[in-house]
């Protein structure tokens, strides 16, 4: 990862840091690539499934009625599949409560953003 790329911590609604954004790529706390963010702030898994959107805070949210995207897109692969996360991150800002029918993906459904080697909805090797 180049030194010019800024890592933005992504928080849960509880205030825990659970991911990093090195735009447009998302990485988990261990530094593994877990997703991609479009210019419209839509979040996709490494397997190309729609997961939700990047809200202010920042945090990753989705509507319960949307579900996990069955339609897939081809997302660009980062130059580096892994980053070295920093040892310390800033405290989470105060975030508004979620409205009814909206969930925090990293808090309630983190399995929607698996690393590239994992995930139930990845393509078969056959």
Predicted regions and their residues:
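Compact, well-ordered interaction domains used in eukaryotic information-processing assemblies
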Residues: 24-25, 30-57
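Long terminal segments
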Residues: 1-8, 49, 55-126
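Preference for short coil/turn "hinge" residues that link or interrupt alpha-helices
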Residues: 14, 30, 47, 93-96
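N-terminal leader/targeting segments and the first structural element of proteins
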Residues: 1-34
């Amino acid at each position: 990862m180049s030194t010019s790329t800024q890592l933005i911590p992504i928080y849960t609604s509880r205030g825990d840091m659970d991911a990093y954004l090195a735009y447009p790529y998302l990485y988990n706390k261990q530094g593994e690539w877990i997703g991609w963010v479009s210019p419209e702030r839509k979040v996709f898994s490494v397997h190309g499934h729609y997961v939700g959107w990047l809200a202010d805070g920042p945090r990753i949210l989705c509507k319960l009625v949307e579900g996990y995207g069955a339609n897939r897109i081809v997302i660009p692969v980062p130059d580096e599949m892994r980053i070295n996360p920093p040892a310390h991150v800033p405290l989470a800002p105060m975030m508004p409560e979620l409205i009814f029918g909206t969930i925090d993906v990293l808090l309630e459904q983190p399995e929607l953003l698996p690393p590239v080697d994992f995930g139930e909805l990845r393509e078969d090797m056959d």
